[in-house]
Amino acid sequence: MNDYFRIKKIKGYQILDSRGNKTIRVKIETYGGISETGDAPAGASKGSREAIELRDKDGGVTRAVELVNTLINDSLRDFDVRNQLGIDQTLIRMDGTPNKSRVGGNTTIATSIAVAKTAAKAMGLEIFQYIGGPRVRYLPIPLLNILNGGLHAGNELKIQEFIIIPLSFDSFHEALYAADEVYKQLKGIITEKYGKLYTMLGDEGGVAPPLSKTEDALDLVYTAIKNSGYEDKIVMGIDAASSDFFNGSQYEIDGKKLSPDEMIDYYIQLASRYPLLYIEDPFNENDFERFSILQQKLKKTIVTGDDLFTTNIEYLKKGIEKSSAKGTIVKPNQIGTLSETFEYIEFAKKNSIKIIVSHRSGETEDSFIADLAVGVQSDFIKTGAPARGERTSKYNRLLEIENDYGIEYYGKKIYL
């Protein structure tokens, strides 16, 4: 074995995420002197089937750090850092639970990411090249969450994310800069209508105006698109995160209590008024049937599962059997290792499910998911508004990849 690639030491650190919460960073060093780090993000709105985070009673991650510095360091020392599958399988066996509850999904994903980044660096490759090899041909379409509600903001909106999607552009940078124009236009509209106070940012960089009704938020976003002159190039989307406003039998939204069947009509009405290409988690995480009904009724819309699937093949299989969704969110920390993430993506692609690689609301400045999205040739990437360093780090990395490697932006070609 080449010592240059062998793991010499693995160390854990406690760091802060973008919400000021503690999370774990893992650093790997090889005998060849190569080192890299991986960070674990954290969500505010979580699916109940996600991998469990290992946290202290006070919210810290000192137990996770201790596990990295002892058990994981001892178990993975001398592994070839290029053996991603072998290392991830060791982490999975070490944990021994179906939801990573012993070692913690945050512990395993930070380690798994650090492994991939160290291997890429040791091989002299960009991370996206290491992941994707010669198949890398295009850059993903960004889904920019420019107006925040739900658990990501302090207003009364139930819908969590109001998204713009810059499809019809010849390059990634043109698409991103146009979306940024819309974002600035939206801030100007809100300043004029509600005052500058309400251009303060939510967790994912979007504005959080004092609204309570979904259509009022959609009107603001659509007006910003039209005022920017991009009505024929930028479409819209929402992440309802509807499990968060489902009371067990009804959805409490816009001052009303709607039955699950009434929610189908609710989304159909929204899609008739606005250019909604994308609807994520329109129903609670167990309602595969109504996901399917909505997807059948809105054939041109990408109904997408996040809490529905939680990057877990078993739930994706169920969704495919029921034709529940055209798209799936991919969040590596939901499943806990990159190898399981790659397996999930491969299965989704084989079944013609669109891939949306996604951040979490609690992020760090690590730009890894930008490389991941390019490497796996994700259709879309979801990483917040064009604001706040933990969001722009991902966009800036995509701009860097485009500039340095001339990789194309397929825009609406991916969808059409």
From Swiss-Prot:
(2R)-2-phosphoglycerate binds at residues 160, 331, 360-361, 382. PROSITE patterns: ENOLASE. Transmembrane segments: none annotated. Mg(2+) binds at residues 239, 280, 306. One of its GO terms (molecular function) is magnesium ion binding. It catalyses: (2R)-2-phosphoglycerate = phosphoenolpyruvate + H2O. Its EC number is 4.2.1.11. The keyword ATP-binding does not apply. SMART domains: Enolase_C, Enolase_N. The keyword Cell cycle does not apply. The active site is at 204 (proton donor), 331 (proton acceptor). Catalyzes the reversible conversion of 2-phosphoglycerate (2-PG) into phosphoenolpyruvate (PEP). It is essential for the degradation of carbohydrates via glycolysis. Belongs to the enolase family. This is Enolase. It comes from Sulfurisphaera tokodaii (strain DSM 16993 / JCM 10545 / NBRC 100140 / 7) (Sulfolobus tokodaii). The gene is eno.
